Amino acid sequence: MTMNNQRDFNKENKDNLERKYAYHFDYDVIHPLIMRSFKPFFKDGNVLELGSFEGKFTIHLQECFADITCIEASSDAVRKAKDVVSNGVEFIEGAFETVQLKRRFDNIIMTHVLEHVENPNIVLSKIRTEWLAKGGRLFLACPNANADSRRIAVKMGKITHN
């Protein structure tokens, strides 16, 4: 695969037992921890969430921001997200590499997303040159494949890869 438009994002996001464990751990443990870490550094203004998936982290963002835009490549995930978040959140369906935005953002958030992007350099460049407002902040969280919690989950058979 050379370009995002050849990927089937809906197929990639289909639930299986392995992902259900990972998602519930993210929703119940990791998301609140990330919010506690990020929140003191949020700037007033708007926020762009890259890779909103089914809106579970977006719900936390609604506690801090009135102006939220989310980009998600999976149409199935966007549909589910619209069911769980309150009105006022703008969803844009598309791959980060190809989406064009008409404005800049004071806060940009990527939680457990960058590791799924085909070309992270392109996305990070777009964030810096096109999407992040002057003085804006990028909040980024990537999972650690060697973390004890992940290795324990592999040993328990909850996930099959490290």
Protein language model regions, located:
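A short local structural element in Rossmann-fold oxidoreductases
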Residues: 82, 118, 153
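Short catalytic micro-motifs in class I SAM-dependent methyltransferases
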Residues: 112-116
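Short glycine- and Lys/Arg-enriched binding-loop motifs that mark or flank ligand-binding interfaces
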Residues: 47, 132, 153
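Conserved N-terminal segment of class I S-adenosyl-L-methionine
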Residues: 1-103, 107-111, 121-124, 140
